[in-house]
UniProtKB/Swiss-Prot annotation:
Pathway: Pyrimidine metabolism; dTMP biosynthesis via salvage pathway; dTMP from thymine: step 1/2. It comes from Yersinia enterocolitica serotype O:8 / biotype 1B (strain NCTC 13174 / 8081). GO terms for molecular function: 1,4-alpha-oligoglucan phosphorylase activity; thymidine phosphorylase activity. The enzymes which catalyze the reversible phosphorolysis of pyrimidine nucleosides are involved in the degradation of these compounds and in their utilization as carbon and energy sources, or in the rescue of pyrimidine bases for nucleotide synthesis. One of its GO terms (biological process) is thymidine metabolic process. The lineage of its organism: Bacteria, Pseudomonadati, Pseudomonadota, Gammaproteobacteria, Enterobacterales. One of its GO terms (cellular component) is cytosol. It catalyses: thymidine + phosphate = 2-deoxy-alpha-D-ribose 1-phosphate + thymine. PROSITE patterns: THYMID_PHOSPHORYLASE. InterPro entries: Glycosyl_Trfase_fam3 (IPR000312), Glycosyl_Trfase_fam3_N_dom (IPR017459), Glycosyl_Trfase_fam3_N_dom_sf (IPR036320), Nuc_phospho_transferase (IPR035902), PYNP-like_C_sf (IPR036566), PYNP_C (IPR013102), Pyrmidine_PPas_bac/euk (IPR018090), Pyrmidine_PPase_CS (IPR017872). Belongs to the thymidine/pyrimidine-nucleoside phosphorylase family. SMART domains: PYNP_C. This is Thymidine phosphorylase.
Amino acid sequence: MFLAQEIIRKKRDGQALSEEEIRFFINGIRDNVVSEGQIAALAMTIYFHDMSMPERVALTMAMRDSGTVLNWKSLNLNGPMVDKHSTGGVGDVTSLMLGPMVAACGGYVPMISGRGLGHTGGTLDKLEAIPGFDIFPDDSAFRKIIQDVGVAIIGQTSSLAPADKRFYATRDITATVDSIPLITASILAKKLAEGLDALVMDVKVGSGAFMPTYQLSEDLAKAIVGVANGAGCKTTALLTDMNQVLASSAGNAVEVREAVRFLTGEYRNPRLLEVTMALCVEMLLSGGLAQNDADARAKLQAVLDNGKAAEIFGRMVAAQKGPSDFVERYDSYLPAAMLSKPVFAERSGIITAMDTRALGMAVVSLGGGRRRATDPIDYSVGLTEMARLGASVDGQQPLAVIHANNEDDWQQAADAVRAAITLGQKAAEETPVVYRRITE
């Protein structure tokens, strides 16, 4: 028998906690026998004293085990359970293509996703732009979709890692969100509860990233890879660029539209293609679905070219109660804003830098994101035809097309877009799309 205050005292004094102590405290959070004040105190001591790798693994496993851990054995599936998690960015619509692409190559992708908060978009919000799309199927329906289609994208239910929800809410109001051991446990508790064989992490770097510096992004990637592998899930991470909007669009319906056009081959933004392919390659290799990088890329290109990935996306939408002909008629189903017009720079020049976070907040100001978790979303608004770093802009070549529902919102977003983009006379050096692969 342990006392919560003694566990806090031990960590406060810089000592390592045992697996049993950590599990006791996390179960206490779940069972409401540990107070908010005690959660806050432990979070702050971890923030200042960090955690060893065994402590981090124990914390993650305890949070995972605070609720249901999915088990797929009874379905006798003939492929691995694999997933991807991104630390979030702007125009990061990779999940919508990646899930169907990997499923088309023989993987099973039980993706449990989140909503957008702050400048980052949320996969669930994007999917809810599709009429009827059900992000909370019951457990048997979720399992059936995985068995029949190979991929489902759903929201976190109350039975998955419930201790994390309470722990995170306390961290959010006590300035302890940006602790690497706590971020790692929060991300992985939910992902490992999916019952995965392998996971790939997409850790963003740059002006639109969750972590403010390259070094902190790298530290987080290494922590997640170390803890996930320590917990028995084969995991790699890619550090990818978020110094500009990843897709050509940012919003909800506009990103879904781009995802469908990507899958059907109508239009594939080169940077979005590179990141999506790189993440899919990791998933195929980790899941044993390809022999090497070239083999994985060939398989993935084949399912894009032959339409299998697009077909699986359509089947997933239909299985989750969206329209059965969504891929064929997406424009007739997705909501459109009342006003769509381009924004131009006030002078001509070459785009040398972007404040990607500010561009994400421009989408929020249009109504396409949330400042608070309870805010409603306007699915129709956003940015499209985003200019890229290094592009020349003038009175004919816009910075973006803004989709708004009134003139005032359009003007406010136009001012924000102009302010977020730096112009010069000489192109900046091209940044890599994928900076680094981390395996341990």
